[in-house]
Amino acid sequence: MEKMVVKDSDEKDRYSLEEIKNKVILGDALKVLKKIDEEIFDMVFIDPPYFLQLSNKKLKRWNVNTVVEGVNDEWDKFQSFEEYDDFIRKLLTEVKRVMKPSGTIWVIGTYHNIFRIGKIMQDLGYWILNDVIWVKTNPMPNWLGVRFTNATETLIWAVKDKDVKDYTFNREYARRFGIGKIGANVWVLPLCQGSERLKDENGKKLHSTQKPIELLKRVILTSTKEGDLILDPMAGTGTTGYVAKALRRDFVMIEINERYIEGMVERFKKPLRITDKPVPKLEKISKYLGLEGLK
């Protein structure tokens, strides 16, 4: 496709950093990670499958006769919790191997999967530093009218083990992005929307769970330095690398879906201009929600 894409193959048994730096590898994350050298990444961001366990039944909104659209992609389908847990365990085991001793990892999820992932991380020896709650200002309503609207996602931030002390934490950015004067672990920002959302040839969203630029900006600025190397083994539409490049960090991404990579390549042709300040309108939203008073 393009020079930024490396196609994995069974014949390839090892990747040097020079081969994959600032590139996306087209391949299976579990296979590709085994071919990467140990202890080279300063930070890892993972947006794994949610395992929503949606039924094939078309659910109708309670107040209008239209169908609810959710995440129903093949990559989100597993046969059981055991299969899902095994996949996550293997992924996190390989990721831990390629993290620097001082590296940190972020994993994002919803109530469907984040608690299982947190337990697996602790079982593997990771030491959780924080959870960060992303409050969505434009969440999908609970159209079925049977439960609360799910307006949050949780990010787990961790190091390789409890003895790690020299990880990067940029406190001023944390205070700037978190709510209240102390910069609490709550980030208020919208879902990916408008021109930021990548579309397919039919004008439909290319990826059902594309993460917003603002979210990755906050992750990267609070936990890395310029020149650091960032890994995203489930890159989707490439937001992690896209933001990393704009913030003068290096990256390696892995993605198995060729359509996502095609969209990613087109995206990278348009350089991202980004500021390290919170988006002003988001600050207004925080005040509207009554969150600015947190001490």
Predicted features, each with a name:
Residues M1-G263, K295:
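Core catalytic lobe of class I
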Residues G27-K31, K281-L289:
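Conserved SAM/SAH-binding loop
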Residues Y50-F51, C192, R273, P280-L282:
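Intrinsically disordered, low-complexity segments enriched in proline/serine/threonine
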Residues M253-I254, R273-P278, I285:
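Asp-based, Mg2+/Mn2+-dependent phosphohydrolase catalytic module
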Residues I261, V265-D276:
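C-terminal helical cap(s) of enzyme catalytic domains, especially alpha/beta-barrels
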Residues L289-K295:
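Radical SAM enzyme core and accessory elements
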